[in-house]
């Protein structure tokens, strides 16, 4: 009897498993080489992030973290590095809100070190000085995203009423 109750508790308990982490796409461009190597190196580096998720089957999701790193030396683009790091995750027993947080913050947090290492490797292979991307607070980014959606949803009825 206790064994049956134990099994039911395990089925209801939240479960999170990483099935696979992989590189979905990557690109490294040096549009102004070799001239860029002959100039004094004083880059301005810009990082753009994006995440998306797809439901593959019951309780199985693909999450893709996209990083675009652009380094400009003066007005010229020194390099452009684009990486899509993806993972397949099995997630069970979460509320809709918890699932959204897992897909929008926790999974990207798992993927980021892999993407950061890949970007660093590509930049090094391009013979540029080492690039270490700072950690990203995906929880804060997700909270900001949720606030923006809530604000947009609150404004939408007001706009509809004004148009009526």
Swiss-Prot record:
Keywords assigned: Chaperone, Cytoplasm, Protein transport, Translocation, Transport
Stored InterPro entries: SecB, SecB-like_sf
GO BP of this protein: protein folding; protein tetramerization; protein transport
Single GO term (MF): unfolded protein binding
Keyword Lipid metabolism belongs to the record: no
Compartments in which it is found: Cytoplasm
Alphabetized Gene3D superfamilies for the sequence: SecB-like (3.10.420.10)
Biological function: One of the proteins required for the normal export of preproteins out of the cell cytoplasm. It is a molecular chaperone that binds to a subset of precursor proteins, maintaining them in a translocation-competent state. It also specifically binds to its receptor SecA.
Subunit annotation: Homotetramer, a dimer of dimers. One homotetramer interacts with 1 SecA dimer.
Family (UniProt): Belongs to the SecB family.
Protein name in the entry: Protein-export protein SecB
Organism: Shewanella denitrificans (strain OS217 / ATCC BAA-1090 / DSM 15013)
Lineage: Bacteria, Pseudomonadati, Pseudomonadota, Gammaproteobacteria, Alteromonadales
